[in-house]
Amino acid sequence: MRTIDKRIAPNVRLAATLVARAPALTLAYDARCKSRLAATLDTGEDVALVLPRGTVLRDGDVLVADDGALVRVAAAHEAVLLVRAPDALTLTRAAYHLGNRHTPVEVGAGCLKLEYDPALADMLTRLGATVERASAPFQPEAGAYGGGHRHGHDATFAEDYALAQQVFDEHHGHSHSHSHDHDHDHDHDHDHDHQHGPSCSHGHHHGHR
């Protein structure tokens, strides 16, 4: 069994014909978040995926097997929810509440896409959004700073929040003063693979005493 253990950096240009000839590894989002995986190429060949921990594969990524051969990643069709709204405010509220639940979201033009979840579908409907179940590739937003799960007590989250607030102030002419006081006397162990994108701006306030 071949082992796939390298991902070519997205900024490395490869000949289109070379990539097109490479066999595809078609995976749903959950599988693309796993760095250790037994998988099957579209050709029927079984392979072992062994990538650095924390790697999240995206549609179009190119991988390298231990024999030097290339493998291209394809996002599989999976059960998703397509969320639309009659106005921008309702769609923004939907994005806010999804962000509060750390839900991975793919942002489209006038539409949000997320993994199928009947509880979330009910919540979004109550908010006034139109929710449609569909089968489609799912590729949620990546973090603005390249990270994954964000919390209010993370330094990178503070940067994201400050940037979002700056943009808001520039557009609305407001000046807001925010004070964050976080006193942590206990450890947190968060193991989340999903990611939030910059287009889904939301605030998280964690006050631990």
UniProtKB/Swiss-Prot annotation:
A single cellular component GO annotation: cytoplasm
Gene Ontology MF term list: nickel cation binding; unfolded protein binding
Cross-referenced SMART domains: UreE_N
UniProt keyword annotations, A-Z: Chaperone, Cytoplasm, Nickel, Nickel insertion
Principal localisation: cytoplasm
GO BP terms in the entry: protein folding; protein-containing complex assembly; urea metabolic process
Entry-linked InterPro entries: UreE (IPR012406), UreE_C_dom (IPR007864), UreE_N (IPR004029), UreE_N_sf (IPR036118)
Feature: compositional bias, Basic and acidic residues: 170-196
A Pfam cross-reference name: UreE_C
Subcellular location: Cytoplasm
Region (Disordered): 170-209
Function per UniProt: Involved in urease metallocenter assembly. Binds nickel. Probably functions as a nickel donor during metallocenter assembly.
Protein family: Belongs to the UreE family.
Name of this chain's protein: Urease accessory protein UreE
Species the sequence originates in: Burkholderia mallei (strain NCTC 10247)
Lineage: Bacteria, Pseudomonadati, Pseudomonadota, Betaproteobacteria, Burkholderiales
Originating gene: ureE
